[in-house]
A protein has these predicted regions:
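Conserved Rossmann-fold cofactor-binding substructure of NAD(P)-dependent oxidoreductases
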Residues: 43-56
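Rossmann-fold NAD(P)-binding glycine/threonine-rich loop
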Residues: 87-109
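Conserved N-terminal Rossmann-fold NAD(P)-binding element of oxidoreductases
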Residues: 4-8
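NAD(P)-binding Rossmann-fold cofactor-contacting core
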Residues: 24-39
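C-terminal catalytic/substrate-binding lobe primarily of soluble NAD(P)-dependent oxidoreductases
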Residues: 127-274
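A short helix->loop->beta-strand "cap" motif at the edges of active sites that frequently abuts
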Residues: 79-82, 103-105
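Hydrophobic/small residue at the entry helix of a nucleotide-binding pocket
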Residues: 12
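Beta-loop-alpha module in the N-terminal Rossmann-like domain of NAD(P)-dependent dehydrogenases
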Residues: 59-76, 89-92
Length: 274
């Protein structure tokens, strides 16, 4: 049985551990002993300590907040370890490709819902239809639109805030552009069967798709319940976003709403937590 190490025992890490535990020997490393099999603070660890830990496992999975994600990925590549990363890091991991090839390290980065699954679908649409445009629309939202801010906490709130503050990259006329996610000129409205009207904002989730050859227009739009963006812009403005989302947004049933479209095809997925 293969040995798998998950770095980070938070909301993502604990679900991954549960999903993999039937088929692999899984251990979780975290600085919090209440969630960790191995108490390990990757932010404070040095290169030797990280190598010593990574050498015990066949695969490393990074499930850390974005500000911590790059360091273990870098050490995995330098060490020749195989690594899958889910963190929404601001760094561009593609700069490590040459080192990874040299050290025979297999790395999959941005392996979440979006970026991640959405990128795979967009890549398949591009290969199949050779489209002029691809638009990714995706959101994790509350099943109940009356939940405060229409949101359910399912991942790191500090990283969630980055979706609204990090400039969003998109492709227009074949060239990379930037826009502020909270610029209301670029907000949009969207409808799905049996779901109240949603609103969308441009977010920085294209990642590897920014280098995709073919489409002249590429964008990712994050979906939220109606009224969410106006409220969030106020929270960001008065620096209370993290506090209010943690306090007000309950742990209830969420759902994923995704639509990826191009000139000749549309893929729609609605997945509700049971």
């Amino acid at each position: 049985m293969k040995n798998v190490l998950i770095i980070g025992g938070g909301q993502m890490g604990k679900i991954i551990a549960k999903d993999l535990s039937n088929d692999y020997y899984v251990q979780v490393a975290d600085r919090n002993p209440n969630v960790a099999d191995i108490v390990f603070d990757v932010a404070q660890a040095n290169k030797v300590e990280i190598k010593e830990l990574f050498d015990k496992f066949d695969l490393i999975i990074g499930a850390l907040p974005s500000k911590l994600g790059f360091k273990p990925l870098l050490h995995a590549v330098e060490n020749g370890s195989d690594y899958v990363d889910l963190s929404f890091m601001e760094n561009d991991p593609s700069g490590l490709f040459d080192v990874a090839r040299k050290n025979k390290s297999i790395v999959f980065h941005d392996c979440g819902l979006s970026p991640g699954l959405s990128n795979l679908i967009a890549g398949k649409l591009n290969a199949t239809y050779n489209p002029t445009y691809i638009t990714i629309m995706v959101g994790g939202i509350s099943q109940d639109p009356n939940t405060p801010y229409g949101h359910i906490n399912t991942w790191c709130v500090e990283d969630l805030q980055e979706e609204y503050t990090r400039p969003a990259r998109f492709i227009l006329n074949g060239k990379e552009r930037l826009v502020s996610p909270l610029n209301s000129r670029f907000w949009s409205k969207h409808r799905f069967d049996n779901i109240d009207e949603l609103e969308g904002f441009m977010s920085d989730g294209l990642r590897s798709l920014l280098k995709l050859k073919g489409p002249d227009v590429l964008s990712e739009i994050t979906l939220r319940h109606k009224g969410h963006l106006t409220s969030v812009r106020k929270l960001i403005g008065n620096n209370t976003f993290v506090k209010m989302i943690k306090e007000k947004c309950p742990t209830k049933k969420d759902m994923v709403v995704m639509r990826i479209e191009c000139d000749d095809a549309t893929i729609t997925m609605i997945d509700k937590q049971q």
